[in-house]
Structures are given as structure tokens and as C-alpha cells.
Amino acid sequence: MLVLLAGIFVVHIATVIMLFVSTIANVWLVSNTVDASVGLWKNCTNISCSDSLSYASEDALKTVQAFMILSIIFCVIALLVFVFQLFTMEKGNRFFLSGATTLVCWLCILVGVSIYTSHYANRDGTQYHHGYSYILGWICFCFSFIIGVLYLVLRKK
């Protein structure tokens, strides 16, 4: 049981780190023709990065930014709640609060990455492919779901 809890803790920390990288890095879309990439915050070329995004005024991008930030906040809160429950909870109880908070993080990732996918990542005729930040977002989606379900199922022994 201790090994399982330690493994979940390590995966949870990795998820927090990957969420930070996914949200901060500017590699959600990468151009196939020129050396350029676009993120949630900046547009980067091989020379420099600029804060001016051609679609920055769109509400969809602001929604994606908000939900990705919320997912980081809920993931960190869930990690802190798990550590707190690990040391204060009585034996035999389940990690309901940690699991619920992690599943809220999972929903925030789902909404954020899905909106980005529907508005920006699937345009026909474009010369772009998905960058590592976008892929990390979906990996964090999977990890946070697995962690959340495991928190709900596990009991403290």
C-alpha cells in the first residue's frame, strides 16, 4: 500500500510539473513551413517571441488560458490536500477530498484542451501540427483522471 501511495504521489507531482510546462510553453501549434510556434501566451519564431497573437482577442483563447490556470491551481490544491489527509486522516477512510479536487482539475483540463482543439488545432488546409505543450495537456488529462479515481477508491491503511 505504501508503494502504491508513493507511486500516486510521484505521478501527481509529475502531472503538476507537466501542467506548468504545458501552460507556460509556447509550443501548442508548430508551423511545418517556417520555424515558428504558437502557444497560449506568445507567438515565437526562430528569432524572437512576441506577445501579439493574431487570435488573442478571441474569447476561446481566453477561456483556454483560464481553464489551464484553474487546472494547475486545482492540481496543486489536490496534492496539498492529499499530503494533509495522509498525515491526519484516520485509518480506513478514503481520500474523497483529494479525489474530488483532482477530478475538478481533470474537468478543467478537459474543457481547456477541448476548446483549443475545436477552435485552433483542427483547421483544414493549415501548415501546422500539434506541439509538445498540446500533447502534454492531453497526457495530464489522462493522468489526472487516473489519479482522481485512485484517490476515490483507495483507503488509508
From Swiss-Prot:
Pfam families: PMP22_Claudin (PF00822). Keywords: Glycoprotein, Membrane, Transmembrane, Transmembrane helix. Glycans are attached at N43, N46. It is found in: Membrane. It is a multi-pass membrane protein. GO terms for cellular component: membrane; plasma membrane. InterPro entries: EMP_1, PMP-22/EMP/MP20-like, PMP22/EMP/MP20/Claudin, PMP22_EMP_MP20. One of its GO terms (biological process) is bleb assembly. The chain crosses the membrane at residues 1-21, 67-87, 95-115, 134-154. Belongs to the PMP-22/EMP/MP20 family. This is Epithelial membrane protein 1. It comes from Homo sapiens (Human). The lineage of its organism: Eukaryota, Metazoa, Chordata, Craniata, Vertebrata.
